[in-house]
């Protein structure tokens, strides 16, 4: 089944970095599946992507020529052919499950065969800085609305729709939660630890933001101050504006964190200020790559050049990334900070022939 899906490309773009919330000191592995029916044009399109923290590492697209799970990060390419064979089998099995589920759900909702419908799934696990299991997830949605979710106890389900009560009863009878919990607490954690170790130069690094401020006159009476943070990793960052030391949260225009195209991220926050009062406003930047928070104030004598080319390039790449990974869902926001890198010993039981994802064929709606 599915996870809360974006229904338009705009939502997909705005949700590019909207991964599930994690806590301080933790790391996460998430898989996002999306299936979209297309009546009269063959079988549904199935796209899956896997993320470790903010980094996409695998991708599968049923429309691709290869029909294979494909690497999206250098450190995953070292996995052997057994790994890729199993991952591909899991993806194809999940695609077929979703194909059946789309028909089942259409019946639950008494919908005609003419319209296009969407199923999504998000599942995964978090580990702490010591590599131990913290929590697991499984959330599903249908046509952009919550459908069913695994509860925090990993033993029960919450149905968010009347039709989902049917699914809940089916899954309870099939002991689906127990099967999923075994994966989340076991193989999911083992593979996440393995990935963190193999990709530690990328996944456990911290790149502090490069910051500056720009000034944009609106009229003779007002101007926009924009606070920029560029080239940082991980994606979690806080930009806040203050006026005479008081937070201006409600008056701040804040964009979603965006990939820059080089493995780092970008973000800006802006406020409209009365002309002549710019010095009363300060921008405060917090990121784990900084030894202490930064405070920026507009300095008229040293107005920087806005890196428009870099920003546009990042936005163009963002479109390509999300179109290729149609599943980075719009609901979940990474809000953690202070994720400290550690050494994650590879679990001996991480069998490449099993793969790090899970075939969800048992969870038919």
Curated annotation (Swiss-Prot):
The modification Phosphoserine is found at residues 343, 349-350, 352, 356, 359. Its main location: membrane. Residues 207-298 are annotated as: Alpha-3. Residues 25-308 are extracellular. Residues 1-24 form the signal peptide. The modification Phosphotyrosine is found at residue 344. Residues 333-365 are cytoplasmic. Residues 115-206 are annotated as: Alpha-2. One of its GO terms (biological process) is immune response. Residues 209-295 form the Ig-like C1-type domain. Glycans are attached at residue 110. Residues 299-308 are annotated as: Connecting peptide. It is found in: Membrane. Residues 339-360 are annotated as: Disordered. InterPro entries: Ig-like_dom, Ig-like_dom_sf, Ig-like_fold, Ig/MHC_CS, Ig_C1-set, MHC_class-I_related, MHC_I-like_Ag-recog, MHC_I-like_Ag-recog_sf. Residues 346-359 have a biased composition (Low complexity). One of its GO terms (cellular component) is phagocytic vesicle membrane. The chain crosses the membrane at residues 309-332. SUPFAM superfamilies: Immunoglobulin (SSF48726), MHC antigen-recognition domain (SSF54452). Gene3D superfamilies: Immunoglobulins (2.60.40.10), MHC class I-like antigen recognition-like (3.30.500.10). Coiled coil: none annotated. Keywords: Disulfide bond, Glycoprotein, Immunity, Membrane, MHC I, Phosphoprotein, Signal, Transmembrane, Transmembrane helix. Involved in the presentation of foreign antigens to the immune system. Heterodimer of an alpha chain and a beta chain (beta-2-microglobulin). This is Patr class I histocompatibility antigen, A-108 alpha chain. It comes from Pan troglodytes. The gene is Patr-A.
């Amino acid at each position: 089944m599915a996870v809360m899906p974006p229904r338009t490309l705009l939502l997909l773009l705005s949700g590019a970095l909207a991964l599930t919330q994690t806590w301080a000191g933790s790391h996460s592995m998430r898989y996002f599946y999306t299936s979209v029916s297309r009546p009269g044009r063959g079988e549904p399109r199935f796209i899956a992507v896997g993320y470790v923290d903010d980094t996409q590492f695998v991708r599968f697209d049923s429309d691709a020529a290869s029909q294979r799970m494909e690497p999206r990060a250098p450190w995953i390419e070292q996995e052997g052919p057994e790994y890729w064979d199993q991952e591909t089998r899991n993806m194809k099995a999940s695609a077929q499950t979703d194909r059946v589920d789309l028909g089942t759900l259409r019946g639950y909702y008494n919908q005609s065969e003419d319209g296009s419908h969407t199923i999504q799934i998000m599942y995964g696990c978090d580990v702490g800085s010591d590599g131990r299991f913290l929590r697991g997830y499984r959330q599903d949605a249908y046509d952009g609305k919550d459908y069913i979710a695994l509860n925090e106890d990993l033993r029960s389900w919450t149905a968010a729709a009347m039709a989902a009560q049917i699914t809940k009863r089916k899954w309870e009878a099939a002991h689906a939660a127990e099967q999923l919990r075994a994966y989340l607490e076991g193989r999911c954690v083992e593979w996440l630890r393995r990935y963190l170790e193999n990709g530690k130069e990328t996944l456990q690094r911290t790149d502090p933001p490069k910051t500056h401020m720009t000034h944009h006159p609106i009229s003779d009476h007002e101007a926009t101050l924009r606070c920029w943070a560029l080239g940082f990793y991980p994606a979690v960052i806080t930009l806040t504006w203050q006026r005479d030391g008081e937070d201006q949260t409600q008056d701040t225009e804040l964009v979603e964190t965006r990939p820059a195209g080089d493995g780092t991220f970008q973000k800006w926050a802006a406020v409209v200020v009365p002309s002549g009062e710019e010095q009363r406003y300060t921008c405060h930047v917090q990121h784990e790559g900084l030894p202490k928070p930064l405070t920026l104030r507009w300095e008229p004598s040293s107005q920087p050049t806005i890196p428009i080319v870099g920003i546009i390039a990042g936005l163009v790449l963002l479109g390509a990334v999300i179109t290729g990974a149609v599943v980075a869902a719009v609901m979940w926001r990474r809000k953690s900070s202070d994720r400290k890198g550690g050494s994650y010993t590879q679990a001996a039981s991480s069998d490449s022939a099993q793969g790090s994802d899970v075939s969800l064929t048992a969870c038919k709606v």
